UniProtKB/Swiss-Prot annotation:
InterPro entries: Cyt_c_oxase-like_su1_dom, Cyt_c_oxase-like_su1_sf, Cyt_C_Oxase_1. Component of the cytochrome c oxidase, the last enzyme in the mitochondrial electron transport chain which drives oxidative phosphorylation. The respiratory chain contains 3 multisubunit complexes succinate dehydrogenase (complex II, CII), ubiquinol-cytochrome c oxidoreductase (cytochrome b-c1 complex, complex III, CIII) and cytochrome c oxidase (complex IV, CIV), that cooperate to transfer electrons derived from NADH and succinate to molecular oxygen, creating an electrochemical gradient over the inner membrane that drives transmembrane transport and the ATP synthase. The keyword Transmembrane applies. This is Cytochrome c oxidase subunit 1. The gene is COI. It catalyses: 4 Fe(II)-[cytochrome c] + O2 + 8 H(+)(in) = 4 Fe(III)-[cytochrome c] + 2 H2O + 4 H(+)(out).
Length: 209
């Protein structure tokens, strides 16, 4: 998590440097897109989720509920160990070909590439699938723990605000993940089957993109 935080911060600094001056520093829009995309996923899935929710929350939430442990302790392990391969795939996607940035699909105004790049996009997509599965497992665990593992006197209105914040975050995460999964699947289909979900020249929708 700390390593991901440092990596994400360094990517953030590159973005700030690029945007904080007139003219271009990187001289490559695709590279900039790759950095923006990678920085977002690294920060969310590999810093905030495992450290603040996983590591910190796993210990603090049961403590605040008066519970001996999380509802499914082994599920937490599974959730965590999906993240290292996911991070590896994401970083590999940036190293292969010209990376997966905003120009994943054939949407010319946003990407310098007029054709899809192959393995890079697949690596990024499967990385996000793993991170998504990990998040779902964690969210189910937290929701179940907060609903079922409270001691008798701990009514919902007596829950500490930290526990409420984790509870609401987990619910919102479960609501938003199908949208992410749908978008990722459409990107995968769009690239591999030459459909036009996003490509405006083929009747697709740039807003959806």
């Amino acid at each position: 998590g700390i390593w991901s935080g440092l990596l994400g911060t360094s990517l953030s600094l590159m973005i700030r440097t690029e945007l904080g001056q007139p003219g271009s520093l990187l001289n490559d829009d695709q590279l900039y897109n790759v950095i923006v995309t990678a920085h977002a996923f690294v920060m969310i899935f590999f810093l905030v989720m495992p450290v603040m929710i996983g590591g910190f929350g796993n210990w603090l939430v049961p403590l605040m509920l008066g519970a001996p442990d999380m509802a499914f302790p082994r599920m937490n392990n599974m959730s965590f160990w999906l993240l290292p391969p996911s991070l590896t795939l994401l970083l590999s996607s940036a190293a292969v070909e010209s990376g997966a940035g905003t120009g994943w699909t054939v949407y010319p105004p946003l990407s310098s590439n007029l054709a899809h790049m192959g393995p890079s996009v697949d690596l990024a997509i499967f990385s996000l699938h793993l991170a998504g599965i990990s998040s779902i497992l964690g969210a189910i665990n937290f929701i179940t723990t907060i609903i079922n593992m409270r001691w008798e006197g701990m009514l919902m209105e007596r829950l500490p605000l930290f526990v409420w914040s984790v509870f609401i975050t987990a619910i919102l995460l479960l609501l938003s993940l199908p949208v992410l999964a749908g978008a990722i699947t459409m990107l995968l289909t769009d690239r591999n089957f030459n459909t036009t979900f996003f490509d405006p020249s083929g009747g697709g929708d740039p807003i959806l993109y």
